[in-house]
Amino acid sequence: NATGWRDGSRAVRGLLKAEGIWVKGAHIIDGSGLSYRNRLTARTLTETLTLIATDPELRSIRNALPTAGQSGTMRNRFLQSPASCARGQVVAKTGSLPPTVSTLAGFTTSPNAPSRAFAVLVNDRPAAQAWSATSAAIDAVAAAAHGCSR
């Protein structure tokens, strides 16, 4: 019901704001993220991920994310160079709204460096560009955040 979604949206925005997370420009229409009218910035996502990584009560969310090249929706990602150097070192949530939106948000992990939160959002992907090319480009950006270089 629309009233329930509105109340839920206000509650989520209020919680984010109370934690000091940037919510300017955030539009949460439904709780699933499947509405084309939902809007979040990379900053909002990255700050939320940072909270997840630092709050012991939320850490289980991070631990549930699939690993690049190994599990879940990330099983077939980060397999080709230049992103392959981050295989097994990135945990993230994929997202897409066909035909033009593709996203990846999560963490880089390394035994030798602190974890880094990242969010890559692609809107208005050219219709002629294949999903695989978009995914490869997003993976390369996340790999660069991990510290991989070309």
Summary of predicted features, one role per range:
Residues N1-R59:
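A small/polar active-site loop signature that marks catalytic segments
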Residues A2, V12, A136-R150:
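Short, gly/Ser/Thr-rich active-site loops of penicillin-recognizing serine hydrolases
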Residues I29-G31, A64-G69, T94-G95, T108, ...:
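Active-site-proximal beta-strand/loop segments in catalytic clefts of secreted hydrolases
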Residues Y36-I61, T103-L104, T109-N123, A137:
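Active-site-proximal alpha-helical segments within enzyme catalytic domains
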Residues A42, S71-N76:
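Large, well-folded core regions of big proteins
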Residues I61-G72, A137:
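Active/binding-pocket-proximal capping segment
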Residues L79-N112:
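Short, Gly/Ser/Thr-enriched beta-strand-loop segments that form substrate-interacting elements
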Residues A127-I138:
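Short, charged, low-complexity patches
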